[in-house]
Amino acid sequence: MGGPNAGFTSLAAALDYLQSHPKETVWAMNWDAPSRPLDRQINENLVLLVLAGPDCKTERAPLAWLGYPSTKQTADFDAKKGEPPRLVQAWTAAIEDAAAKANRQDTDIGYLIHDAGNTHQDSSARLGALAQTLTVQLPEFDFLKQSFNLTAVLGETGAGTALTNVALGIAYAHHFGKPVLVAGTSDLSAPVALVVAPPAVARPIRPDQPWFRARGGNHAYLPWWGLRHDAPEYYQGFSQ
């Protein structure tokens, strides 16, 4: 998986490493500046995930739990009368598999973060197939209210897309306590799904309290670690 899905490839390799080194940590990173040579564009970004193995003594509560990304090839499905399009079948299988890899049911999914965009030549096909899939797979899911379209806001983010959406999924699961589906829609022949599971204790956003990262430019770039077990207090959006 490359292009906007490159981060999923890096993340899968990182999770593979932790499977064989459960007491260690690994970094997964993606970045891109698709508008280069223009600079200071909102679609240039970098995300670094510091992942801990299940037996790593971090002395911190997890922000969230990540399942493996799952991808399915549309060519592996048949186009038949009375059946949904092959892309929808591939999405259905990928989402079910991704949920299982996160030890969840697909019906547990409470939010969607995706990269279908709204100006790309394939945006309509991306959105249509994903929306059709979730409408059938999760009948109570409100696609408009329960989703965030990253590239509709920032523009095409290139190789910086996948892990940016995973990071947003971590934040949503952490604060709202619901599993999040991260969908990689850019390859219409091979959709990618990943489920982020929430921690045991969610930390709801308190709108009446300060948000640490809004205090200044330097604070915005500080790492967001899991809350230390010995932390005397909790700052929204930050832990030492």
Regions found by a protein language model. Give the residues of each.
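A contiguous, mid-protein "functional segment" used to position or interact
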Residues: V182-R206
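Conserved beta-ketoacyl condensing-enzyme motif
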Residues: M1-G2, A98-L130, Q137-L138
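Membrane-proximal bilayer-interacting regions
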Residues: E156-A162, G169-I170, H174-V182, L188-S189
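Condensing-enzyme catalytic core mediating Claisen C-C bond formation in acyl metabolism
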Residues: P34, L38-D97, A197-Q240
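Well-ordered, non-membrane alpha-helical segments in soluble/globular domains
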Residues: L11-A12, P84-A98, D122-L134, L163-A167
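Cysteine-clustered segments with highest specificity for TGF-beta superfamily mature ligands
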Residues: T25-M29, K178-A183
